[in-house]
Structures are given as structure tokens and as C-alpha cells.
Swiss-Prot record:
Classification lineage: Bacteria, Bacillati, Actinomycetota, Actinomycetes, Mycobacteriales
GO biological process, one term: chorismate biosynthetic process
Cofactor entry: FMNH2
Function (record text): This reaction introduces a second double bond into the aromatic ring system.
CDD domains in the cross-refs: Chorismate_synthase
Species of origin: Rhodococcus jostii (strain RHA1)
Originating gene: aroC
Domain of life: Bacteria
Pathway noted in the entry: Metabolic intermediate biosynthesis; chorismate biosynthesis; chorismate from D-erythrose 4-phosphate and phosphoenolpyruvate: step 7/7
Cofactor annotation remark: Reduced FMN (FMNH(2)).
Protein name, UniProt field: Chorismate synthase
Record-linked PANTHER family: CHORISMATE SYNTHASE
Length: 395
């Protein structure tokens, strides 16, 4: 089974991603990972930290000469800002006198509404929010994006598919309504300042960000992830835990600041009658055809051959320049929340992180379905299955 885990803190020496269960022969280089991490840094409305918090990638194990070996994979994403934080974030004990002179070591006792600060301090018994925010930070997603680079390559090699995303809306901007983008549109989407597929939508989103910036505020939005060309039958209806839509929802909700997920037309489907909610089928020259894709490529917890389409709603960033009211946990008195460097809007980057989680989950489901110890073996298993499906549909 494909499994992943990350370790590290926002201002620690590095983030580490571990990926276990990936087959041998997946083609990935350090440059490939760096490319995906650079995409994660895209987006109008990002803070100044994006300019100097570079991602230095080191593949520690599981890869030789650009191909996976079949064993556990470890990737380190170094923090170029580490020298500034080495004393504050040292894993070993530090003399109190050294810490006293460090402005960065000032206790953070005023939790930010909407952040993990308050609950984390109480749950783990911390007097300071620093240990909470260091791990809860969205910086951790860099490690997930690194791990997902292997899943993306696996899906490309076995199925010939690409994972892509685009921003549907930011703040109160009019949501994009139109055709789903394809892999050939990805470069144009990444070239957009807000990773929008539509120029008019892009202008509306930028205007929203500019207004929020002037007001000392932050914005959330909605992103959509799309994969064209997946085979029928990834996932299962056998149990709730096996349903691919449930697994995708869990993975997307596990991204920092994501507060809602929908598959296909999702919540809008609940407003329709059944005759207008489902995707009718008809015979075609090469199999079953659908006139719509309201289900987002998933029925009964399984892929149905249509484009996989899922959306995630991101709340506004909780580090608000116009600091929100809170309580100082050291005194119990009214206060304003702590404010550190932050973005006005990170929705474009959230799309790249959402791609990563979808890639990991879909690759996991693909390996469960087709097995194998190498790309060649998994591909052969898939092609045999695909031939059988095609033969059934040709009857």
C-alpha cells in the first residue's frame, strides 16, 4: 500500500517527506521536484517570504539515476532561512541567556482566531504558540508536494494522464463557469497570476486581492483539480473506507485552511431533481458515452472513465494584518492576535497542493487495483485489464 508521512517545522532546518510502497522504475529527478515546489510558490497575493524562502531539494533515498528503486523514498526540502532560526528552533537544549537576546524567541501568547494556536496550546500543554504554528504552518505542504511528484510521474507513465488544477474563485469574485481545462492548458494556467483558466475571471480575482490588501485583510477561494483519462474502476463500493471520493475528500480536507470539498457538481446537485442530476449513458463506437459529467468522474466510490473533478474551498488566511481580537493566554486579558509575515491570498498555491494530494490518493488506488513491483509490471496489469474492459464494451 502506498503510504506517506512528513516531518519538520516551518522554521526548522528542513522538511522531510517519506513515501513507502511506490514501485520501481518511476522517473523522477531533483529538478522535477523543484519544478513542482516552484509551482507551489506561484500566485498573486503571496507574501514577501516567497521571495527568500527557497526550497532546496535533496533526494535522500529510494532513487538511483533518476528512477525509483522500489524501496522507501525520502526527500528533504531544506530551509534557506535556517541560520536565522538555528538557536530558536534547535532540537538540542539551548542556554537561556542565548535565547533571551533573540527577538524571535518572544513568547507567542495571543492565539490567532481561525488558526491552530489556541486548541494546540491547550491540547499539548504549551505556554507559547510557537510549537503549534511551526508544525501547523502551510509550509509543511512543501513536503507533500515533493512526495506527490513521484505519484504524478507514476500516473503519467502508467496511464498517460496529468493532474492539473485551476482557481474557480477568490473571495467574492464571480466563479468560473465553463469547460474543464485539459493537460494542454496547464502551462497557460500556471502563467496566470492567480492560476485562472479564464481571463475575465482572472481580472475579477486580482481586483478582489487588491481590495483586501488595501483593507489589511485576507481572502480564501475555491480550487478545482481535474484528471482526464483515468480507467474505470479505481476505488470500490465495498466499504466506506474504500470509496475513492471519501479518500479524496479526506486528503483534501487535510490541507491547511481547507474547509469544504465537493466532487463533481457537489452541492449544486442537491438542488436538482434526479433527472437533472445524473449523467445519462448511451452507446458509442468505442464504449459508453456521457453527455455530462455532473458526477465528477466518480460513481459509487469508483472512477467511471469520465474526467475526475473535485473542488476544495479554502478559508481566508487566519494571520490577518488587521489583527483580530483574541485573549492573551498568559494574562487572560483582551488582546489583539499575533501577526507574522503572511499572504493576502494563497488560493493559487492551494491548487498545487490539492493536485499533490489527489495524485497521491489516485496513485494509491491504482496500485491497489493493478499491483506490481515495477512500472512495467503495473502497466502490463493495467493494459490487460483495459483490454478486458474494452472487449466487454464491444459486445
Amino acid at each position: 500500500m502506498l503510504r506517506w508521512i512528513t516531518a519538520g517545522e516551518s522554521h526548522g532546518p528542513a522538511l522531510v517527506a517519506m513515501l513507502e510502497g511506490m514501485v520501481a522504475g518511476v522517473e523522477v529527478t531533483s529538478e522535477d521536484i523543484s519544478t513542482q515546489l516552484a509551482r507551489r510558490r506561484l500566485g498573486y497575493g503571496r507574501g514577501a517570504r516567497m521571495k527568500f524562502e527557497a526550497d532546496k531539494v535533496t533526494i535522500v533515498g529510494g532513487v538511483r539515476h533518476g528512477r525509483t528503486l522500489g524501496g522507501p523514498i525520502a526527500v528533504e526540502v531544506g530551509n534557506t532561512e535556517w541560520p536565522k532560526w538555528e538557536t530558536i528552533m534547535s532540537a538540542d537544549p539551548v542556554d537561556a541567556e542565548l535565547l533571551a537576546d533573540q527577538a524571535r524567541n518572544a513568547p507567542l501568547t495571543r492565539p490567532r482566531p481561525g488558526h491552530a494556536d489556541y486548541s494546540g496550546m491547550l491540547k499539548y500543554g504549551f505556554d507559547d504558540a510557537r510549537p503549534v504554528l511551526e508544525r501547523a504552518s502551510a509550509r509543511e505542504t512543501a513536503a507533500r508536494v515533493a512526495a506527490a511528484t513521484f505519484a504524478r510521474s507514476f500516473l503519467r507513465q502508467v496511464f498517460g494522464v496529468e493532474v492539473l488544477s485551476h482557481v474557480i474563485s477568490i473571495g467574492a469574485s464571480d466563479p468560473y463557469v465553463g469547460p474543464e481545462p485539459t493537460a494542454s492548458d496547464l502551462a497557460a494556467i500556471d502563467a496566470s497570476p492567480v492560476r485562472a483558466f479564464d481571463k475575465a475571471a482572472e481580472e475579477s480575482m486580482i481586483a478582489e486581492i487588491e481590495a483586501a490588501k488595501r483593507d489589511g485583510d485576507t481572502l480564501g477561494g475555491v480550487v478545482e483539480v481535474v484528471i482526464h483519462g483515468l480507467p474505470v474502476g479505481l476505488g470500490s463500493f465495498i466499504s466506506g473506507a474504500d470509496r475513492l471520493d471519501a479518500r479524496l475528500a479526506s486528503a483534501l480536507m487535510g490541507i491547511q485552511a481547507i474547509k469544504g470539498v465537493e466532487v463533481g457538481d457537489g452541492f449544486e446537485t442537491a438542488r436538482r431533481r434526479g433527472s437533472q442530476a445524473h449523467d445519462e449513458m448511451r452507446p458509442g463506437p468505442d464504449g459508453i458515452l456521457r453527455s455530462t459529467n455532473r458526477a465528477g468522474g466518480l460513481e459509487g466510490g469508483m472512477t467511471n472513465g469520465e474526467a475526475l473533478r473535485v473542488r476544495a474551498a479554502m478559508k481566508p488566511i487566519s494571520t490577518v494584518p488587521r489583527a483580530l481580537a483574541t485573549v492573551d493566554m498568559s494574562t487572560g486579558e483582551e488582546a489583539v492576535a499575533i501577526h507574522q509575515r503572511s499572504d493576502v491570498c494563497a488560493v493559487p498555491a492551494a491548487g498545487v497542493v490539492a493536485e499533490a494530494m489527489v495524485a497521491l490518493v489516485v496513485a494509491q488506488a491504482a496500485l491497489e487495483k493493478f499491483g506490481g513491483d515495477s512500472v512495467a509490471e503495473t502497466t502490463a496489469n493495467y493494459e490487460r485489464y483495459a483490454s478486458g474492459v474494452a472487449a466487454r464494451l464491444a459486445r
